[in-house]
C-alpha cells in the first residue's frame, strides 16, 4: 500500500477532532510541534489503496497572519501547509456555517494543494432547514466534496474512497481579483524561487499584499520588492488587503447563493432557548459554579466507587504478591520489604488515582464537545475584563482542572503576548486532578460530613487566587486593557461517545504514564533512604532513618503553617510534590505506613491472589450500588473512604501527626498554591521564558506560605496569641514590600513571550519526524 500524509484543517468547532477520532480511533500519537509546546496529534488509518498518516492541524479561520501577536495556532497551521509535507488536505467545513468556513477553503484551493472538502455537521444544518447542493458545490470549488456527520460515522467510507481517487484539484478560477492586484502578485511571483509552482508563488504574492508577515519568509528576494508593489497600488486603490478580502467574500457569496439557502435558514431554537438561561447575566455564574461542583461530585462519587478494584487489586498483585514471591524464593527480609514498599507501593499509589482522574477527564471532554466550554468563557468575560483579559482566556484555566500543563499551553490561543503571559501565570493556581487525589484523602481523614464542602472550597480558593494574581499583575508589572472579545458560540449537541472515550483515554494514559514513572521512582528512592541511617546502617525504626534526620532540620520552616517537628513526613511530601503533585499521596502513603509494613508479619500460606482479587471486585460492586444512594450523594467524600492503605494505618498516623483539622486544611492550602510540578514548570519556561518560570515559582511559594500561615495562625490564635500575631504581621509586611517592588519594576519588565520570538517558520516546516 502507498503511504500518504494528509493534513486535517478547519475552523474551530467544525467537528475536526471528532472526524480525526473517527478515522484514526486509538491509533494516535500526541507530541509537540518542533520548537513550541503546541500539541501535535498524528493518527494512522488505512484506505483500500493507502496507508495514511493523518496530522490534526490547529483550528484556524484563515491562513493570513497579520501580526506576530496572532495566536500560534494560525502560524503553525499556515507553516505546515506551506512546508509541503502534506500530500493532501482534508478541509473540514461546518455545513451550518458554510459562508464563514469557505474563506479558509478558498485560501487552500488557491494554494493549489490537492484538497477534499469534508462537509460536516449536516445533521445540524438539516435541523436549521439548511439545504446544500453537494454536487454543485464540488463543481464550483473544483474539488471533491464529501457530506459527513462525523458524530455518527456517516460518510466516513465515502471520504476514504475520495482519498484513494483524488490526485489534483480542477483548474477552476475561483476569485476574481482586480487587475492591479494580479499584476503586482505576478511581479512578486517572478522574483521568487522558480522551482516553486507558479500557483503557489502567486498565492504568496497575494498573501504579502494582504499583509501576511510569515509569507515573506518563503518569498526570498521578492520580499524586498513588496514596498515597491504597495507604493504602485496606493495610486490605484485605497487598501489592497481590503480589496483582496472583499473579492474572496464576493466569491463566497456567489457560491452560497447557487448551492445553498443559508439566507433563509433558521437558527437552532434549542440553542437559543438554553442560552437565554446559561448566558443570563445573573444566572450564568451560579450555573457555571454548579457545573464545576457537578464535575467534582462525579469524580469523587463514581470514581471513588471504582477505587476498590484498582486499590485492593494492586495491593494483592504488587504488594502481597511481591511479598509472597520474596518469602517463597527466600529473599532477604530487607529486600522483600524494599520491593513491596518501594515498587509495589508506588504502583499501588498510581492505580487508585485512575478512576477519579478518568472521570474528571471524561467530564471535561463532555463539556468541550457539547459546546458549554465556550459559554463558560462568555459568562466569565466580565470578570476577566476586570483583570485586563478577554473572556476566552478563562478556557485554558478551566482545562487546568484536569491538568495545568495543557492549561499553560492553551494560552497560545490568545492573541496578545501580555494576555498569554498573564494567563500562564494564573494557570498553576487551578486545582488539577492530581491535587484532587490529595484533597480526597485528607477530606476522608479529617473533615467527615464536611468533606465535600472542604474540597469544593479549595477548588474555589484556587480560582480566587488565580483571579487575585491577575489583578496583581494588571496593577503592577502588566498594565493594559483586554483586546476585544469576539468568540463563536457553537450549537449545542450531544457529544459522540467514541470521541469522548478516545479523548479521555489519551489524557488518562498520559497522566498515568507521567505520574507512574515519577511516583514509582520516588517511592523506591524514599524506601531506600527510609531504610538506612546517615551512617549507612540499616534501621529498624524509620524515625532513625537518614530521611527523617534530614527532614527534621527543614520542618521548623513550616511550623507557621501547622506542620509540627515530629510530622517530618509532611515536609518530605511537599518536596517530592514539586516533581508531581500526585506524588504527595504516594510519599505520605509510603512514609506513614512504613512502620506497619515492617512490623506486620506476612504469612505466605495465607496468601491467595484469586481470593483477594474477587474481594476487590465484590467491594467495587458494593461501592457502585451504594454510590447512588441518597446518603452518599449528599456527601460524596464517603465514596473515597475506601482508599486502601491510606484508609487504615496511614490515615490513623496522619491524623495523629497533624493533630487538628485546621493544620490539615492549612497544609492543603499550601499544596494547592505552592510551586507547580516539574511538567508545568517546563511548559511555563517553553511558553514564556525561564525568568517567568522563576517568577511563577517564587510568587506561588509566597502566596501559599502567606495564606496557609494566615489561616492556621488565625484559627489557632487562642493557643499562642503572641506567636500568631508576630507571624500574621510578618506576612502582611512582607507582601506589602513585594507588591511595592513589583510596582516599581514594571518599566523594566519584558512581557514578550519566548514562543513569539522563535522562528516558527523554521521550526514548523519540518517533517513528521519533528514531532517529539
UniProtKB/Swiss-Prot annotation:
GO CC, any one term: plasma membrane
Binding, GTP 1: 10-17
Domain annotation FeoB-type G: ranges: 3-169
Induction of the gene: Iron uptake is repressed by the global regulator Fur.
Keyword terms of this UniProt record: Cell inner membrane, Cell membrane, GTP-binding, Ion transport, Iron, Iron transport, Membrane, Nucleotide-binding, Transmembrane, Transmembrane helix, Transport
Family: Belongs to the TRAFAC class TrmE-Era-EngA-EngB-Septin-like GTPase superfamily. FeoB GTPase (TC 9.A.8) family.
Protein known as: Fe(2+) transporter FeoB
Protein species of origin: Salmonella typhimurium (strain LT2 / SGSC1412 / ATCC 700720)
Amino acid at each position: 500500500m502507498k503511504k500518504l500524509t494528509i493534513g486535517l484543517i478547519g475552523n474551530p468547532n467544525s467537528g475536526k477532532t471528532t472526524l480525526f477520532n473517527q478515522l484514526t480511533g486509538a491509533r494516535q500519537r500526541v507530541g509537540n510541534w518542533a520548537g513550541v509546546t503546541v500539541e501535535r496529534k498524528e493518527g494512522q488509518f488505512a484506505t483500500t489503496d493507502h496507508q495514511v498518516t493523518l496530522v490534526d492541524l490547529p483550528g484556524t479561520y484563515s491562513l493570513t497572519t497579520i501580526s506576530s501577536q496572532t495566536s500560534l495556532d494560525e502560524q503553525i497551521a499556515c507553516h505546515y501547509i506551506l512546508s509541503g509535507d502534506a500530500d493532501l488536505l482534508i478541509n473540514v467545513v461546518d455545513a451550518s456555517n458554510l459562508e464563514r468556513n469557505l474563506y479558509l477553503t478558498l485560501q487552500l484551493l488557491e494554494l493549489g494543494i490537492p484538497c477534499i472538502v469534508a462537509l460536516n455537521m449536516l445533521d445540524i444544518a438539516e435541523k436549521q432547514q439548511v439545504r446544500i447542493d453537494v454536487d454543485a458545490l464540488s463543481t464550483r470549488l473544483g474539488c471533491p466534496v464529501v457530506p459527513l456527520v462525523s458524530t455518527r460515522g456517516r460518510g466516513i467510507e465515502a471520504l476514504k474512497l475520495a482519498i484513494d481517487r483524488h490526485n489534483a484539484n480542477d483548474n477552476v478560477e475561483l476569485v476574481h481579483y482586480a487587475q492591479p492586484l494580479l499584476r503586482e502578485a505576478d511581479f512578486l511571483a517572478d522574483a521568487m524561487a522558480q522551482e516553486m509552482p507558479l500557483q503557489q508563488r502567486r498565492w504568496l504574492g497575494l498573501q504579502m499584499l494582504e499583509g501576511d508577515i510569515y509569507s515573506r519568509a518563503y518569498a526570498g528576494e521578492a520580499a524586498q520588492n513588496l514596498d515597491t508593489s504597495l507604493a504602485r497600488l496606493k495610486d490605484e486603490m485605497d487598501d489592497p488587503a481590503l480589496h483582496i478580502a472583499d473579492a474572496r467574500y464576493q466569491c463566497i457569496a456567489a457560491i452560497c447563493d447557487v448551492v445553498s439557502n443559508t439566507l433563509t435558514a433558521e437558527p437552532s431554537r434549542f440553542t437559543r432557548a438554553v442560552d437565554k438561561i446559561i448566558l443570563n447575566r445573573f444566572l450564568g455564574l451560579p450555573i457555571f459554579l454548579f457545573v464545576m461542583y457537578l464535575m467534582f461530585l462525579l469524580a469523587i462519587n463514581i470514581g471513588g466507587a471504582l477505587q476498590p478494584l484498582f486499590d485492593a487489586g494492586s495491593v494483592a498483585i504488587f504488594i502481597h504478591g511481591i511479598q509472597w514471591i520474596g518469602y517463597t524464593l527466600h529473599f532477604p527480609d530487607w529486600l522483600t520489604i524494599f520491593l513491596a514498599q518501594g515498587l509495589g507501593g508506588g504502583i499501588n499509589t498510581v492505580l487508585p488515582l485512575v478512576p477519579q482522574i478518568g472521570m474528571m477527564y471524561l467530564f471535561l471532554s463532555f463539556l468541550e464537545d457539547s459546546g458549554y466550554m465556550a459559554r463558560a468563557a462568555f459568562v466569565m468575560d466580565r470578570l476577566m475584563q476586570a483583570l485586563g483579559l478577554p473572556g476566552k482566556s478563562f478556557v485554558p484555566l478551566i482545562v487546568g482542572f484536569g491538568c495545568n500543563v495543557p492549561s499553560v499551553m492553551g494560552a497560545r490561543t490568545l492573541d496578545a503576548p501580555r494576555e498569554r503571559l498573564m494567563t500562564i501565570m494564573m494557570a498553576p493556581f487551578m486545582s488539577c486532578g492530581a491535587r484532587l487525589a490529595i484533597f480526597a484523602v485528607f477530606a476522608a481523614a479529617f473533615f467527615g460530613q464536611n468533606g465535600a464542602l472542604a474540597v469544593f472550597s479549595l477548588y474555589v480558593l484556587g480560582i480566587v487566587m488565580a483571579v487575585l494574581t491577575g489583578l496583581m499583575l494588571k496593577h503592577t508589572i502588566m498594565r493594559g486593557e483586554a483586546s476585544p472579545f469576539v468568540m463563536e458560540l457553537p450549537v449545542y449537541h450531544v457529544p459522540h461517545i467514541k470521541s469522548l472515550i478516545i479523548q479521555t483515554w489519551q489524557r488518562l494514559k498520559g497522566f498515568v504514564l507521567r505520574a507512574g514513572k515519577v511516583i514509582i521512582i520516588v517511592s523506591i528512592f524514599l524506601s531506600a533512604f527510609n531504610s538506612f541511617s546517615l551512617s549507612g546502617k540499616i534501621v529498624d525504626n524509620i524515625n532513625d532513618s537518614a530521611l527523617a534526620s534530614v527532614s527534621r532540620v527543614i520542618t521548623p520552616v513550616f511550623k507557621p503553617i501547622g506542620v509540627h517537628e515530629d510530622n517530618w513526613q509532611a515536609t518530605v511530601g511537599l518536596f517530592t510534590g514539586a516533581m508531581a503533585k500526585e506524588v504527595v499521596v504516594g510519599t505520605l502513603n509510603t512514609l506513614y505506613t512504613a512502620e506497619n509494613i515492617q512490623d506486620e508479619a506476612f504469612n505466605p500460606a495465607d496468601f491467595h491472589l484469586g481470593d483477594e482479587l474477587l474481594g476487590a471486585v465484590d467491594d467495587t460492586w458494593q461501592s457502585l450500588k451504594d454510590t447512588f444512594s441518597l446518603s452518599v450523594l449528599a456527601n460524596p467524600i464517603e465514596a473515597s473512604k475506601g482508599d486502601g492503605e491510606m484508609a487504615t494505618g496511614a490515615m490513623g498516623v496522619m491524623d495523629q501527626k497533624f493533630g487538628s483539622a485546621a493544620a490539615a486544611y492549612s497544609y492543603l492550602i499550601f499544596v494547592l498554591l505552592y510551586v507547580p510540578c516539574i511538567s508545568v514548570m517546563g511548559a511555563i519556561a517553553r511558553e514564556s521564558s525561564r525568568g517567568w518560570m522563576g517568577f511563577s515559582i517564587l510568587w506561588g511559594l509566597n502566596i501559599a506560605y502567606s495564606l496557609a500561615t494566615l489561616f492556621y495562625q488565625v484559627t489557632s490564635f487562642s493557643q499562642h496569641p503572641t506567636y500568631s500575631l508576630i507571624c500574621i504581621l510578618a506576612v502582611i509586611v512582607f507582601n506589602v514590600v513585594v507588591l511595592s517592588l513589583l510596582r516599581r519594576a514594571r518599566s523594566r519588565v519584558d512581557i514578550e513571550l519566548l514562543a513569539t520570538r522563535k522562528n516558527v517558520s523554521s521550526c514548523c516546516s519540518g517533517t513528521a519526524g519533528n514531532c517529539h
